[in-house]
């Protein structure tokens, strides 16, 4: 394990470093929200149909968009949630881990809310790349209609290439993400400035009264339009999830200095263009540019959407890693793609599942216009979950009274529920897709957690207290196991009981090592555990010791490195004369268990698909001994 300082939450120590991290945040954190101008205003205009949209409605729509950005992104995320961190880390599961420690009475409720938020985020990780890249590549149709039939194949090809290079890591190219996205935001702002003068009446959008008046006059149509207006803030969850990568200061600076002004200017420019040229409602973003600039803008937009997609994919990898370490999912293979950056990881199973999902969505919907109807539910749902968890965080971590927390967060929750309600009207048009994805992932995580709990209860009935076992083997008798030289390390989840693999070793091999270490690996409710707190050793007798290794939910659980650190600090053992004993369970579904039969089978399938603990914990393969047992659950 690298020293904890290597992967501590990011902090800028000087101005050049602060500027570099700010530019980096522009590329990674704001890539998704930066691609929203491609389709958000266009989709908001769509419910008004072929009769066209009135001037007051255009101003009202832009006003809604600007104030949604201000309230949801600026107030909730940039100013409020970026302060709600778990030792510098943000994100739904990071917040959940902290709350499960601070408020254990509500563990089940918060667990359900947390895995719902995580499941919705993974659904978003499938939809965002498909929608963003399709939106950008569709600009080619304005360059020449001949590209019409090639938009989908080109988009799918880009996605296949993007997911194919994940195993190589993004360290070499990620240095370009920030500068390219910065150029993208500058182009957004410049395009907006160039068109605001088309009709200065659009500046009335700064007045929130126009947003309220629009909703009041539009009635049910206005409520439906909220679903499209919400597209302006998709990607806001990335601000919070990437808190540990860049730190609060650079993320806030990037928003106020570059991103918010650029988005504001661009939406105002699109609105002014539609006011002066009503026919531009078909594609107000790309029609802002002259013909000679279309191809460069399409290429830049494609690059921006690829970067946005990369940020979402990386976020999904990080989220799944957290879920594994917190015990919400079985162990998947985790590959580290950088020798210096522990946060750069690649999960083959997750990568392949995301790619399959993205391609299926692209072929199902065929265009960004159709896919936009499926978008929004996952994002609004995740935001609602985050607000609920933030309410508990404010009470338990900051000591806010219930009244204060309600006064601050209830208006936000009500607003987000309105957006969620508007998006739910899209269910029949494709909105069912993120619900199905989230439902499947929630069921998977709930099944795994419940199955592991039932398995522990089942095996606990047969457990022998470690103290009782030690007393038994210390007795001199003709049936005592033969002592052999060397050290044996037995992995177990319950240090007070005798590991089943130790009992099996004595039963079948009739031997006991000279030194026996009962090893427990704990995942703390914090992102990273400092090296000084990595382990504790307790000597129980001349033959037995207890060793506990502690890792954070963002740590690489490298047991070999941790043991090497223990050896440096006085824990005497020789790795080449040490054997690691692991238990391998063959699970059998029972007719009567704590889970329905289908869930039993799902849990067993997940357990069978989990990566070998030897590989996951980085144990030396030639020193590992596995003993199996059959367990009926």
Curated annotation (Swiss-Prot):
Q: What does this protein do?
A: Transport of potassium into the cell. Likely operates as a K(+):H(+) symporter.
Organism phylogeny: Bacteria, Pseudomonadati, Pseudomonadota, Alphaproteobacteria, Hyphomicrobiales
Question: What HAMAP family does the database record attribute to this sequence?
Answer: Kup
Q: Which family does it belong to?
A: Belongs to the HAK/KUP transporter (TC 2.A.72) family.
The record's Gene Ontology cellular component field reads: plasma membrane
The cross-references to Pfam families, in alphabetical order and at most eight, read: K_trans (PF02705), K_trans_C (PF22776)
Where does the UniProt annotation locate this protein? Answer: Cell inner membrane
Extract the GO molecular function terms from the UniProt entry: potassium ion transmembrane transporter activity; symporter activity
Q: Which domain of life is it from?
A: Bacteria
Q: Spell out where the chain crosses the membrane.
A: 18-38, 61-81, 109-129, 145-165, 173-193, 211-231, 255-275, 287-307, 345-365, 371-391, 405-425, 427-447
- Name-wise, this protein is Probable potassium transport system protein Kup 2
PANTHER family per the UniProt record, alphabetical: LOW AFFINITY POTASSIUM TRANSPORT SYSTEM PROTEIN KUP (PTHR30540:SF79), OSMOTIC STRESS POTASSIUM TRANSPORTER (PTHR30540)
